[in-house]
């Protein structure tokens, strides 16, 4: 079922979308777009606490996803089941579930949204594009994406409501 959905998404393939989604997915590589945004927020006194919370959410989501859940589930990537699909990016060697790009992106996007809707809405839109790019590029199953969304969102909610909400209302 999931491979059928991925194959349907893959049928959207065209040169423009190929370049677009390769560029979008690269923003999520090693969480670089989120780390840069976090540093920018840290450098502004008004947004420093938000930057700390966002980066902490990113760090915890990455740790739980990459170090605990991926080795525990040990799910192979979709391209291993369908080798005739041409992969447009370097083939990831780590396990598939949950999507690290998606988890990191939603950790940051959700945390920003909880703190500041103006910052959060564009961040969630970017997170959604990054998540979709992982399926378009055939490196994640839809449930990997869902797992990343749930993990990143859960970490952000826990951090925000247990630690940061009070600190941010004091500002």
Labelled PLM ranges:
Residues 37-63:
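Interfacial segments of alpha-helical transmembrane regions
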Residues 56-70, 121-133:
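Small-polar-interrupted transmembrane alpha-helices in polytopic inner-membrane proteins
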């Amino acid at each position: 079922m999931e491979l059928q959905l991925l194959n349907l998404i893959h049928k959207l393939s065209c040169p423009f979308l190929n370049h677009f989604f390769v560029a979008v997915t690269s923003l999520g590589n090693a969480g670089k777009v989120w780390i840069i945004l976090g540093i920018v927020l840290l450098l502004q006194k008004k947004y420093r606490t938000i930057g700390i919370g966002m980066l902490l959410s990113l760090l915890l989501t990455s740790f739980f996803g990459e170090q605990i859940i991926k080795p525990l589930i040990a799910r192979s990537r979709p391209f291993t089941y369908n080798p005739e699909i041409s992969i447009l990016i370097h083939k990831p060697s780590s396990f598939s579930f949950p999507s690290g790009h998606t988890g990191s992106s939603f950790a940051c996007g959700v945390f920003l949204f909880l703190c500041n809707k103006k910052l959060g809405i564009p961040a969630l839109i970017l997170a959604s594009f990054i998540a979709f790019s992982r399926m378009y590029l055939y490196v994640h199953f839809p449930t990997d994406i869902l797992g990343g969304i749930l993990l990143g969102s859960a970490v952000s909610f826990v951090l925000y409501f247990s630690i940061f909400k009070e600190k941010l209302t004091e500002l």
